Design a protein with these regions (language model features):
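A generic structural motif
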Residues: 24-30, 34-35, 74
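Alpha-helix termination/capping residues and helix-transition junctions
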Residues: 24, 45-46, 92
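Charged docking surfaces used in two-component/phosphorelay signaling
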Residues: 14-18, 22
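Conserved acidic carboxylate
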Residues: 7
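Non-catalytic signal-transmission and effector/linker regions of two-component phosphorelay proteins
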Residues: 1-2
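Charged phosphotransfer/docking patches of two-component systems
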Residues: 10-14, 86
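Acidic, metal-coordinating helix/loop segments flanking the phosphotransfer/catalytic sites
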Residues: 17, 32-51
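CheY-like receiver
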Residues: 49-93
Length: 93
């Protein structure tokens, strides 16, 4: 399985990476990507991952803006402390 982490807080990204490795030591994990711009560039130049773990609020916008071009077979799990994005996240996939 291939995963991508989009998270602008180093500590949170490392915690998530550790949890994923504990679940599946064979998992390939890319990231963390820290901005919408960086995420768009990565998605254009790499094959779609199986799953994306994305913080919503990033330093240059919201991750929804970068994920529009994601393959519809890619699962997206939003990880955020901001409940105002919950409805939009539920509607995303």
């Amino acid at each position: 399985m291939n995963a991508l982490i989009i998270e602008d807080e180093f500590r949170n990204a490392n915690r998530l990476r550790k949890m994923l490795v504990d679940i599946d030591p064979e998992m390939r994990i890319d990231g963390p990507l820290e901005t919408v711009t960086e995420t768009r560039q990565w998605l254009r130049s790499h094959p779609a991952p199986d799953v994306i773990f994305a913080d919503i609020r990033l330093s240059d916008g919201v991750s929804f803006d970068a994920l529009d071009a994601v393959d519809s077979h890619t699962a997206v799990v939003f990880t955020t402390a901001y409940d105002e994005y919950a409805l939009q996240a539920f509607q995303y996939n």
